Amino acid sequence: MTVTGAYGVRLSGLPVDTWLGVSGAPHWPELSCEMDSRSDAPELALDMDTRKLRVRDDIAHSEFVHPLLGRVASQVALARGADAMHAGAVAGSAGAWAVIGPKGAGKSTLLASLNDIGVPIVTDDVLVFRDGAVMAGPRCIDLRPDAPRRGLGIAVRPSDPRSRIALPPIAAEHDLAGVIHLEWSSGETAMQPLDHRDAIRRLLILRSDKGYPRDPQALLDLATLPTLLLKRPRSLKQMDAAVAQVERLLCESGGRAAARR
C-alpha cells in the first residue's frame, strides 16, 4: 500500500500529497502536520515529543517537499537513532547505492538521466539511513536552470527557480549496498574503486561541509562498504557514458530494483 511519506516518516494532515508516495512503511513513525496561520510563525516547527509538525500556511507544498522536509527529516533521523547525509541514491536488486557529490557535481542531473532509462531513484538530495537500510525520499528531482538535461520538468520554487521531475512511488526502504562519489574530469568517463582510506577522507569532507553524518561510527560503517569514484567530463554528450557505468554496476551487483525485506 502506498502511503504519504518520505525520509523514514509518514505524514498526515497535509492538504495535498503530491511527490510523497512510498510503499511498505507501516512501521515508520507518523508526523501529524498542522497548518499555522500566524504571519510570524517559523516555516516549520517540529515537536518530537508529540510528533507534530507545524507548517506555516503560506509555504507552498513544492517548497515543503523540497528543501524544507529534508531539513526536518535530518532532525527526526537523529532523534530516532538514524543518521542522514547530503546524497542521492539509486536502487538495484542487491540494494541501493548512495550517490555523493559536492554542490555543482551534477548529482541531480545524473539521477534524472538514470530515471529516464528506468533506474529506480531512492532519493535525490537527502539520504536517511539506519542499520544498513536507506529510506526513500520525495518522489521528485529538482534541477537548477543551468543543469544540462533531456526533457522538461515543471517550474517550482519561485524563490529559487528550478524544474522538477516527478518520480514514481517506490519501496520505503532498501539495503545499502555501496557508495558512488562523483567528480568532474577532463578525460574520459570512468569508474574506479576507492580504498578504505580515501572513502573515509571523502566522507569526512562531506561531514565537514554539511554536518552529516553526525555519528562517527555511522561514517566508519559507510566507509567499509564498496566505494567507487565516477569521473566524467562536464558534457551532456558524455552523460550516456556515465549512465551506462552506473547501469552496468547495478546489473553486475544483481540487477535493478528490489526493496528491503
Where are these regions (language model features)?
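Long, basic/Gly/Ser/Thr-rich N-terminal segments
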Residues: 1-60, 244-261
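Glycine-rich, often acidic-flanked micro-motifs
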Residues: 3-8, 14-17, 88, 92-101, ...
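Short linear motifs at secondary-structure transitions and domain/linker junctions
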Residues: 19-33, 58-67, 73-75, 96-97, ...
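Extreme N-terminal, non-catalytic leader segments
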Residues: 36-93
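Walker A (P-loop) phosphate-binding loop of P-loop NTPases
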Residues: 104
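Post-Walker A alpha-helix
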Residues: 110-111
